[in-house]
């Protein structure tokens, strides 16, 4: 059932809400904001809890204990989280867009997402190994395909 087509984000239960996350890992990338222009830049430096091979958080349930600055995406804050990538299901649905063809809820697995290049799989380094974030700015997280 395509619950995301029949319900608003606010109407979804916890299981439905959590299943919207495709697990791409882009939200777990460190981001920089230019002080003068306020432009957002993604880096390939991932949160220390992110598994670079598949994009899942190794301590998802307890992530706030390990990374207090981690942001939980909720129906109440999704509109404010402008740093979420355009490919993010929460952002897409909030903006009235459809889920993309590669989304795991459409395809039944994360493989199509990885093949489409929409995840962090094998593209990141751990933030603890980065000396200068500016040296790790990348454009691929901005990619958004239907």
UniProtKB/Swiss-Prot annotation:
Signal peptide: none annotated. Pfam families: CxxCxxCC. It comes from the Bacteria. Belongs to the UPF0260 family. PANTHER family: UPF0260 PROTEIN YCGN. This is UPF0260 protein Ssed_2516.
């Amino acid at each position: 059932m395509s619950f995301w087509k029949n319900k608003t984000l606010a109407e979804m239960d916890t299981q439905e809400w959590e299943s919207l996350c495709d697990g791409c890992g882009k939200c777990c990338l460190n981001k920089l904001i230019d002080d003068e222009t306020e432009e957002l830049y993604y880096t390939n430096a991932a949160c220390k809890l992110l598994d670079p091979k598949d994009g899942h958080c190794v301590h998802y349930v307890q992530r706030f204990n390990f990374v207090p600055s981690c942001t939980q995406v909720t129906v109440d804050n999704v509109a404010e989280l402008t740093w979420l990538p355009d490919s993010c299901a929460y952002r897409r649905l909030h903006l009235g867009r459809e889920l993309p063809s590669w989304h795991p809820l459409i395809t039944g697995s994360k493989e199509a997402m990885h093949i489409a290049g929409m995840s962090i799989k094998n593209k990141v380094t751990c933030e603890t190994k980065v000396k200068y974030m500016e040296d790790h700015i990348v454009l691929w997280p901005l990619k958004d395909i239907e």
